[in-house]
């Protein structure tokens, strides 16, 4: 099919691409007409035979493509986005974590060395790799300033008296470390309850126990200390004290009971009027105080 002469094709930027699509289906002996034929009353089963003969992909089989500047830009942007997506998909992460810049060995080497002529690469083995990633056009003066700044920082750390100095070996759990714990061992132990040791009463061999064995311990009679007065134990007759004979007599012969006091019978008065014995008298003083009245009670 002729779309025009060569001048017109060059002005319209016609591009001729010869695409040779070879079907990759396993049904090579089946003709193409049966593969692409779609009936009106039945469903389309073309996707089951070959992926290349879909309606959308059939449009790509055109022999000529009309392209303009706008379409070229869109295709370039689309290709860049697809390449970026592919790059994101191809990102791979390392299984092992990156080692820290300040490892224990490098930090101990920094504290040990007192010289200030150590280079940045010797102290930080990974520093060179970080610097290479910045830019190749960086001037040497910037790196010299970085080295000077690092040297000043290390010098301040070494000259600072308040910085805690770490030991030579960072193996704090090594068996060479010795801790003095004698102060903790001298602490007096806690008061423990001690059981009172009771004397065991031994029974004579002639005694025979009958019945069940009793688990209750018999109450042991402890000898009590009794204090006696010296005069009672060893009296002395020189000082007028009691002798042992007097003590024995008092023990053997208890004191006699005191005799009851016998009162003499009182004289019973009799009444002068009746002659009967008087039981009680009541004397009443008069108002003037000059005289009195006596009332007697008689028996009988």
Curated annotation (Swiss-Prot):
Residue intervals passing through the bilayer: none
Domain of life: Eukaryota
Keyword NADP part of the UniProt annotation: no
InterPro entries: XRI1
GO CC terms in record: nucleus
Subcellular location(s) of the protein: Nucleus
UniProt keyword annotations, A-Z: Meiosis, Nucleus
Note: The induction by X-rays is dependent on DNA damage signaling by ATM.
Subunit annotation: Interacts (via C-terminal domain) with MIP1.
Protein name (Swiss-Prot/TrEMBL): Protein XRI1
Provenance organism: Arabidopsis thaliana
Annotated gene: XRI1
């Amino acid at each position: 099919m002729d779309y025009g002469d060569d001048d017109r094709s060059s002005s319209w930027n016609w591009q001729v691409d010869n695409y040779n699509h070879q079907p990759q289906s396993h049904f090579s002996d089946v003709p193409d007409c049966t593969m692409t034929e779609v009936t009106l009353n039945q469903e389309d089963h073309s996707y089951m035979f070959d992926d290349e003969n879909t309606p959308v992909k059939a449009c790509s089989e055109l022999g000529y493509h009309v392209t303009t500047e706008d379409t070229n830009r869109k295709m370039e942007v689309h290709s860049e986005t697809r390449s970026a997506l592919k790059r994101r998909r191809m990102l791979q992460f390392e299984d092992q974590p990156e080692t820290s810049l300040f490892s224990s060995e490098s930090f101990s080497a920094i504290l040990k060395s007192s010289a200030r002529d150590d280079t940045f690469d010797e102290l930080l083995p990974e520093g060179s790799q970080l610097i290479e990633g910045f830019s190749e056009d960086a001037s040497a003066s910037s790196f010299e300033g970085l080295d000077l700044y690092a040297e000043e920082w290390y010098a301040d750390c070494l000259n600072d008296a308040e910085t805690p100095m770490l030991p030579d070996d960072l193996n704090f759990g090594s068996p060479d470390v010795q801790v003095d714990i004698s102060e903790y061992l001298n602490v007096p132990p806690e008061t423990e309850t001690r059981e009172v040791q009771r004397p065991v009463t031994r029974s004579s061999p002639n005694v025979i126990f009958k019945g069940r064995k009793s688990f209750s311990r018999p109450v042991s009679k402890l000898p009590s200390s009794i204090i006696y007065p010296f005069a009672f134990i060893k009296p002395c007759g020189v000082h007028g004290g009691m002798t042992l004979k007097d003590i024995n007599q008092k023990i053997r012969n208890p004191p006699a009971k005191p005799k009851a006091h016998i009162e003499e019978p009182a004289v019973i008065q009799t009444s002068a009027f009746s002659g009967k014995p008087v039981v009680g008298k009541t004397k009443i003083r008069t108002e003037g105080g000059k005289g009195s009245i006596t009332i007697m009670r008689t028996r009988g």
